[in-house]
């Protein structure tokens, strides 16, 4: 799976860049995810899926240590959630993700998000 960190739609590389991988995970950068809002990134995924119909596109949102935003992301049922495992909220957020079938990752493992 090819992981692409995005800030805004114009930040996504050229479409021919994706031809090598049929699975793409767009990850909204934490500095921009809360600012632009979840709907923005859902639209980005939708637009990219329309342009690349033969690809499977997951959406991941990086939330830093913002439990309120993480709850919004979980409610929207995105594919992946990136959260700081050092957060005191990790256990609760992880449990909710498991209940909803959302993959949760330690945000610190993606150095490009730090």
Regions found by a protein language model. Give the residues of each.
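Glycine-rich phosphate/diphosphate-binding loops that line cofactor/substrate pockets in enzymes
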Residues: 15-21
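N-terminal active-site wall of soluble small-molecule enzyme domains
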Residues: 27-76
